[in-house]
Amino acid sequence: WVHHMFATGLPPLALAFFSAVSLLITIPSGVQFFAWIVTMWKGKVELTVPMLFTVGFLLIFLLGGITGVMVSILPFDWAVTDSYFIVAHLHYVLNGAVVFPIFGAVYYWMPKMTGKMLNERLGKWSFWVMFVGFNLTFFPMHILGVLGMPRRVWTYSNGLGWDTLSMIASIGSVVFGLGT
């Protein structure tokens, strides 16, 4: 977790070491990601509700991983530390990579545990509403962070260019909530 502390005054040698290690973690993560893709590659993939949530997880995890590479580079990390970019990265890596597989697992295992099938059509609606809502909520936060919006802000002055993207993120959170 030291790579989240690049702006705390660590010595240059420690910064270089943890930046390199943060970049190196992309290798096993990339292998893991491509192993998931290859697992589906030659199979007959049916886009059932559990598979939709799985593919949604893969896309969200990919974007979280790409932003992780970005924040492992010191100059960029210093520019976006304590901004909405970090909030968006965290939510893509942690929330998206946890919530979507859990929902997929519920849709997969619940019929096996209860003996009653869940409604496939409602499940697909739930997935698409959640997926669109999640990305409407957190993707604009990347841009807001690059524009300088700090995290833990409850209000801000007009004219900073954050209004529209912040409103989109707020609407996205409502959409995401409706999907769950």
Residue ranges and their predicted role:
Residues 39-42:
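Short amphipathic alpha-helical coupling elements at transmembrane boundaries
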Residues 45-46:
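Membrane-interface helix-loop-helix junctions at boundaries between adjacent transmembrane segments
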